[in-house]
Curated annotation (Swiss-Prot):
Belongs to the four-carbon acid sugar kinase family. SUPFAM superfamilies: YgbK-like. It comes from the Bacteria. The keyword DNA damage does not apply. Keywords: ATP-binding, Carbohydrate metabolism, Kinase, Nucleotide-binding, Transferase. The lineage of its organism: Bacteria, Bacillati, Bacillota, Clostridia, Eubacteriales. InterPro entries: 4-carb_acid_sugar_kinase_N, 4-carb_acid_sugar_kinase_N_sf, NBD_C, NBD_C_sf. It is an enzyme of class 2 (transferase). Pfam families: NBD_C, SBD_N. Catalyzes the ATP-dependent phosphorylation of D-erythronate to D-erythronate 4-phosphate. Can also phosphorylate D-threonate and 4-hydroxy-L-threonine, with lower efficiency. Signal peptide: none annotated. This is D-erythronate kinase. One of its GO terms (molecular function) is ATP binding.
Length: 439
């Protein structure tokens, strides 16, 4: 049986949400028309995404198409129905949400989360901001087919829907999943059939998803993709994967830009960074113990996160004064840098070896670190395939025990604050349906 059914108003949206789940290892298919045999396809795919091509049609026709699609998939008894909406709220939002609620019955509750943090869409105070600009001040207001002239999400939905619309602010989300659970229950008790929620980060989306799950309500996810991705984790069984779909980031750069980039990754993905004790890596008496500690911590969090990372600093105050440290250890600054890079590389090797293929791709930042990682993995080099952003290359390791492992290498002063997110997103997409030669 299909566990997740996505109903989108256009093909691009159907694919965009589907790929978020596909890259987690779930078997996903998009259908241009209703599947002739929904039950058969439900057995073949974990996720079925259907496009109704209804964004620019009359509201009554949009309602009919979505209702037909939802009704056709009811026999699959999916654990989650999703109404995929445009990230700039174009189209027949109200009629299509109404159609879903009418088909799924009076117990269903539409939870609208319009945020898409990795695409610059956040909702705060009920307002949708696109790269910090109010929605109505963006080009979507001049869209020739489906312009949007408002920014308040609840108002946009309420103007089109026959159902009562509630709102849960960011302040509640920041209190945690229990607060979200209680707020959703209160909205349902108050007779709301649609609830709009704020979210500014991936962590917020995860919190909302967990709260929705804890509520036990029959939630219909209404969003451009990321909320569905987060909520599906509570519906779908963990996929069986021959090789891992996780990314390991090994970051030696200590620049302010790098710290901004890593913070953006933490906000966008389920991420766990471990900060090394660089003094321990430098000290030959403590080096092995620190490598074991950090690699163990990374491995402990492997099952719970999509992106794992090892870094040398978290805050500006942790940046080493190489000259004074070199003087204290009576070695050169170059040797200090080399010991740190070698320590990071040893941690990466240990994680890859012990995780037994759970890590599907590498991201390295800092030239010394990239060289050290290649050497630690006995790779003779990187087969370069593409440029992700200027001065950030995607390729595959050449030789060694991890031959052909996907890798992105980037300098510490490369790109804007979103550059690391772009690289991680690229790498996750590349490895989502990756196949590897038998070992």
């Amino acid at each position: 049986m299909s566990n997740v059914v996505i109903i989108a108003d256009d093909l691009t949206g159907a694919n965009a949400t589907g790929v978020l789940l596909a890259r987690k290892g779930y078997k996903t298919a998009t259908f241009l028309q209703l599947p002739q045999d929904p039950l058969e396809n439900g057995n073949r795919f974990d996720v079925i995404s259907i496009t109704t091509d209804s964004r620019a049609v009359a509201p009554e026709e949009a309602y009919r198409r979505v209702a037909e699609a939802a009704r056709a998939m009811l026999g699959n008894k999916p654990g989650l129905f999703t109404k995929r909406i445009d990230s700039t709220l174009r189209g027949n939002l109200g009629p299509e949400i109404d159609a879903m609620l009418d088909v799924l019955g009076p117990d269903s509750l539409a939870v609208v989360v319009a945020a898409f943090p990795t695409s610059g869409r956040i909702t705060v105070g009920g307002y949708l901001l696109v790269h910090s600009i109010p929605l109505e001040q963006t080009d979507v207001a001049r869209d020739p087919k489906t312009p949007v002239h408002q920014t308040l999400v609840a108002d946009i939905v309420a103007a089109q829907s026959k159902h009562s619309v509630g709102f849960i602010p960011l302040a509640t989300v920041l209190q945690g999943s229990t607060a979200v659970m209680e707020a959703l229950g209160a909205q349902k008790e108050a007779g709301k059939r649609i609830v709009v929620m704020d979210a500014a980060t991936q962590k917020d989306l995860d919190t909302i998803a967990h709260g929705a799950y804890l509520s036990g309500l029959s939630v219909v996810a209404v969003d451009p993709g990321p909320f569905t991705e987060a909520l599906a984790a509570y519906v779908l069984p963990k996929p069986k994967q021959g090789r891992g779909k996780k990314v390991l980031m090994v970051v030696g750069s200590v620049t302010a830009l790098t710290r901004q980039q890593l913070k953006a990754v933490e906000n966008a993905y389920s991420t766990c960074f471990t900060t090394v004790d660089v003094h321990a890596l430098i000290d030959p008496w403590r080096n092995a113990e620190e490598i074991e500690r950090v690699s163990g911590e990374v491995l402990d969090h492997l099952d719970d996160h999509q992106v794992l990372g090892v870094r040398t600093v978290e805050e500006a105050g942790q940046v080493l004064d190489l000259a004074s440290v070199a003087l204290a250890y009576m070695i050169s600054e170059e040797e200090i840098a080399s010991r740190i890079a070698d320590g990071l590389a040893a941690i990466a090797r240990r994680v890859l070896q012990v995780s037994h293929g759970e890590v599907g791709g590498l991201y390295t930042s800092g030239g010394d670190v990239t060289v050290a990682v290649c050497q630690a993995l006995a790779a003779s080099g990187v087969e370069v395939k593409d440029e992700v952003v200027p001065l950030a290359a995607y390729g595959r390791l050449i030789g060694g025990a991890f031959h052909q492992t996907p890798i992105i290498t980037k300098g510490g002063l490369v790109g804007n604050s979103d550059a690391a997110c772009t690289c991680v997103d690229y790498l996750l997409t590349k490895i989502s349906n990756e196949t590897y030669p038998a070992e």
